[in-house]
């Protein structure tokens, strides 16, 4: 199956919407085929039925893992510079619980950069199998690695700062010594 283009999504008035177990206003999720209607004007970021043309854009506003394919209608506002749109009508065409899909995607992204760091084996095992029994151990290992990296970076920054301070101090004293020697007679005259 090919991913529809934005133009195809617009032409067919299709979009995506994430939700939790209920809508943000507390109402239950609409059944498949049910149309939600917003009465009143759309007020950007305040009032209206929101959606995005791409699932990853909708994810930015996700209060939960329920992903719906929706058809939008009525009054539609979709600024070119935004990653979302708003309408006065939104009908759910299909819905999935995307929890596993989101976790698998996140794990695959983490595995794709595993070569960039010394990934603990328990983390690799968790990311590969998504075995919940290894989740806490993987989290602890990642935290320990992150703290160790932070400590190493702090130590390197501290060492660099101290070396720079020593260099500045040494240069300043060398300059002072040169000035003193410029105005006092040479040492050999006092021996």
Model-derived features: positions:
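Short, glycine-biased loop/turn motifs at secondary-structure junctions and
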Residues: 1-191
